[in-house]
Amino acid sequence: GEGWGDNDARFLAFSAAVSALGRTAGHQLVHLNDWHTAAAASWAHGEIPVVLSVHNLAYQGRTGVEWIGRLGPNAGAFVRDGACNPLAGAIALADAVVVVSPTFREEVLRPETGAGLDGLLREKGDALVGILNGIDTDDWNPAADPHLPSPFAVDDLAGKALARAALVDRVGLPGHSGPLAVSVTRLAEQKGIDLLLPLVPELEALDLQVAILGAGDAALADALRDAAERHPASLAYVEAYDESLAHLLFAGGDLLLMPSRFEPCGLGQMQAMRYGTLPVVTDVGGLHDTVTDLDEDPANGTGWRAAAADTPSFRSALVRAVSGWSDPDVRLGAQQRGMTADWSWSGPASRYVAAYRRVIE
């Protein structure tokens, strides 16, 4: 999961190639993604409209200021705090900047959540747009998922019970009548899995089992492994990235845990809802835009949102989730709303087309 030491050289060369290709005859704009292609804006700006998508403001590609001399005619925009900052330069030069949810657009304008670029982003005005990502609804489709023991759909959830049984068997948890919560995650500070660790001794009292799939930070993996060994009836941890198991977790889980400290968009909550698994999330970024709290809006709710990214707040949301899940009417209504919502790329694609039109017309 670590980057190569010469990533600055790799992506600078790639960006130069992207810019050269974009400026050839027939192209109407160049669309860059994150810091990896951001340097292309130093050549493209002023010659062809530039759209920049930012998926995570924390990753800016900062490198030595000596790289400025290798950029194009607008290299000065990339100098920031005595370094070369590809993402900052592209934000300054882009004709439109797209962040990956409407709420994340609001967050990046604030000093506490703007990763040092909030002032630059405020200068973009209406050229800063928030467009929620979609998911591949063919790949994430419980009615035709080859990773499941049996297909299921919103009008027949019998296959979901079979998926839960298969999941429990695969990860080694004992039989349990209460809800099974799952998490498919990177082990990184952003994702907030460490906020769950103090709750592990309480899981039995909360009538909750948890299965976590994820890899990344070694210390966090060690802590999860230790917690699972100490509480084998309550917590199962699989240290891996395993797409087949991820599908089974989303299908077999009752609740999805996403205690993110920040989440520009998030895909897991949408994937889980496709499978009738109700999300318990922090109230940040794209999680705010996609999960409606059942206690705040029972008629439209799809999950539960913790008021803050800390252990007490997430515990409170979990308590509410276990209670809500235990009510069959609440559970089924939320499952139906999540499974029938349109999480596809159809809507986001049309909003991207509108953003393209604004910069080329």
Predicted regions and their residues:
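Catalytic cores of nucleotide-sugar-dependent glycosyltransferases that transfer UDP/GDP/TDP-activated
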Residues: 1-361
